[in-house]
Amino acid sequence: MNTILPSDPARDDVLAGRPTLWLNPSYRKQAIDTSDLPVSPADVASARQNWQRLAPLLAECFPELKDTGGDIRSELVELKELREALGYRTREFGNVFIKADSHLPVAGSIKARGGVYEVFLFADSLARQKGVLVDGEDIRKLATEEARSLFSGYTVAVGSTGNLGLSVGIAARALGFKATVHMSSDAKAWKVERLRKLGVDVIQHEADYTTAVENARDIADADPTIYFVDDEQSRHLFLGYSAAASELASQLDERGITIDEENPLFLYLPCGIGGAPGGVAFGAKAIFGDNVHAFFVEPVQSPCALVHMMSGKQELVSVYDVGLTNKTEADGMAVARMSAFVAKVMREMLAGVYTAADDDLFKLLRMAWITQRQKLEPSAAAALLGPDFLLRHKEGRRFQTLNVIEEKMSQATHVLWTTGGSFVPEEQFQHFLDQAESIAAPSDRNDE
């Protein structure tokens, strides 16, 4: 279907594929208290408890988690040299950090938070259902041969552009499940190869992400031995991501950084289908309330959350419906249609969405590597633009005025959530750097 987007300061830029910032007109205070949402702050607390319960098993399955006792955590990295390079040196930019999920253990991306969580919860549920684990027993029993024998009769399946497939495949194989990952046509070859080396069955579809997910769901529905991790509808994925907010809160506290009405927090979250950024944003709202403002970032040709939420429609709108191509080098964000589940949750909770051109992503990727040795993939580099949009773009300045925070920006904290990169093979990463060097002209973004 063709969709006409409503009048909005960002509409022309969106339709032309130019970088821009869209402010959500439905954004409001205390939106997390809405009673008809499919998730609640209590669910976030339960997810944190589940992570703690699963931690001994995670440490047993993944040697890289021994030192953390099974916690999957990433560093909060202060921007120093990179801050200077990005032009965020002045006092008005407040505190600026990277939340380096690009270097998360186990899967090397933010998807470890959702994919590992859901697979391990399924293992726990299945083992209890079949009598392999009973209340009071050590969760590490799920790493024994008895449990692996049970799990080997089941397949965990998922549709993915790459990183979720890696996360789910790694987690499933670690427990002894068979694993199938349905990948879209824009999936990167190195991610396909890595999965196959783990013994994962990779099915590549000559279609985009949405179609790959639909095909995977149909196959799983017909076979009771297949458990489908549904990136479009999964509460488990969403809540697995949400627990990251408490990790961030403790890291800010350790640094003596206060988040309150006078000291706001801004999150910049790369968005594909929306589960990971939506989960993190929801978890942050559960902790910080109206003192945190979450922005998604998407490629100029794949802004699925932006076009759907701007449309104001209940029925999902895809990027194709407004004449965009869904073509981007940021494979983790090459999604034409956002999750309906996430759209409902974030309708009044998302501050806005900004878009980035592929060329800018490569330049930012190279800048992060040269200045501060942060190894990112293109989709992760998109987070680095957030403070620039908020403080220098006309819509960012309007957001400050609307929320009466102009005088508070120097006390604000900006967290740029870098979502993946450490697992990128050296040859591929060098290709990214070479591509960045070949790009000379800046993007055609209009800040006025």
Swiss-Prot record:
UniProt catalytic activity: D-serine = pyruvate + NH4(+)
Q: Which domain of life is it from?
A: Bacteria
The prosthetic group or cofactor this protein requires is: pyridoxal 5'-phosphate
EC assignment: the record states 4.3.1.18
> Which GO biological process entries does UniProt record here?
D-serine catabolic process; isoleucine biosynthetic process
Keyword Lyase recorded: yes
- Family membership noted in the UniProt record: Belongs to the serine/threonine dehydratase family. DsdA subfamily.
Give the protein name, as stated in the record: Probable D-serine dehydratase
Organism, as annotated: Rhizobium etli (strain CIAT 652)
Gene that encodes it:
dsdA
